């Protein structure tokens, strides 16, 4: 990629992604450029007419190649949004689906409708911890347990819990086995 303004670079990356059938190529291009240059959205927008620094172009080219090869954008950027919060994700965990946010909403609604003051919630196969952490943050009186068979996934979940300031009890194990011995689990 030759020397270009930020705006021209966005257009060039958009065209490249579009040529390979990447859905929403313009958004992908802007996000990949921000990732490569470590810019905020505000910085990117306020510098559209400036020349893009060339020192990070190889990084950008690598990121674009990964996206063209269909690597999920969230794995490339290392983050995803879930329930209005940013969670770290990588290949050790599945990317939380937007539909899973409904599970959080329904769990909260269920607890409120039942009038459970101090609910105990279990998230089996927690992955990134997005569901467990979101429930814990939305219901501070809840005691939340999260399990996963993968120690690597639990590292990601624990990192997210620490970053978002919540206490979820994480344990490694297969399905509900690690929750045996706990008294009543409400959800």
Report residues per predicted region.
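N-terminal auxiliary segments of SAM/dcSAM-dependent transferases
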Residues: 2-77
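Short secondary-structure junction motifs
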Residues: 26-27, 116, 165
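Conserved small/polar residues in nucleotide/adenosyl-binding loops
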Residues: 185-187
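Structured loop/turn residues at beta-strand edges in well-structured enzyme cores
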Residues: 166, 182-183
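SAM-dependent Rossmann-like transferase core, predominantly class I methyltransferases
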Residues: 48, 57-140, 144-159, 170-181
């Amino acid at each position: 990629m030759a020397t270009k303004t930020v705006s021209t670079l966005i257009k060039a990356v958009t065209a490249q992604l579009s040529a390979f059938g990447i859905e929403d190529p313009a958004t992908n291009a802007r996000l990949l450029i921000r990732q490569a240059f470590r810019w905020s959205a505000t910085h990117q927008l306020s510098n559209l007419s400036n020349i893009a620094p060339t020192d990070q172009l190889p990084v950008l080219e690598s990121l674009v190649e990964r996206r063209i090869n269909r690597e999920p954008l969230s794995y490339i950027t290392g983050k995803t949004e879930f329930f209005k919060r940013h969670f770290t994700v990588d290949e050790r965990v599945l990317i939380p689906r937007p539909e899973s946010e409904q599970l959080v909403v329904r769990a909260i609604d269920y607890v409120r409708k039942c009038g459970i003051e101090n609910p105990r919630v279990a998230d089996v196969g927690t992955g990134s911890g997005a569901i467990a952490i979101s429930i814990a943050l939305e219901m501070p009186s809840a005691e939340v347990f999260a399990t996963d068979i993968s120690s690597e996934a639990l590292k990601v979940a624990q990192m997210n819990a620490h970053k978002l300031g919540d206490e979820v009890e994480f344990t490694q194990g297969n399905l509900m086995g690690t929750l045996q011995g706990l008294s009543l689990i409400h959800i």
